[in-house]
From Swiss-Prot:
HAMAP family: Ribosomal_bS21. The keyword Ribonucleoprotein applies. This is Small ribosomal subunit protein bS21. It comes from the Bacteria. Gene3D superfamilies: Ribosomal protein S8. Pfam families: Ribosomal_S21. InterPro entries: Ribosomal_bS21, Ribosomal_bS21_sf. One of its GO terms (cellular component) is ribosome. GO terms for biological process: translation. It comes from Parabacteroides distasonis (strain ATCC 8503 / DSM 20701 / CIP 104284 / JCM 5825 / NCTC 11152). The gene is rpsU. Keywords: Ribonucleoprotein, Ribosomal protein. Belongs to the bacterial ribosomal protein bS21 family. One of its GO terms (molecular function) is structural constituent of ribosome.
Length: 63
């Protein structure tokens, strides 16, 4: 369960932003979307390598 402590006089919108950030970090929604359809381990591994290549390429272009 996610708990967001509120300080005295803190804006509700700030608390909602904190909650959303914490919720995103847990990865619940991402996991649920991933489990909607079975994906073979080989496909998952291929996606990871392609993403790693893409990120590495972006870092090289940045330099």
């Amino acid at each position: 369960m996610i708990v967001v402590p509120l300080k005295e006089g803190e804006n509700i919108e700030k608390a909602l932003k904190k909650f959303k950030r914490k919720f995103e970090k847990t990865g619940v929604v991402k996991e649920l979307r991933g489990r909607q359809a079975f994906e073979k381990p080989s496909v998952t591994k291929r996606k990871q390598t392609m993403r790693a290549i893409y990120v590495q390429h972006l870092q090289q272009v940045e330099e």
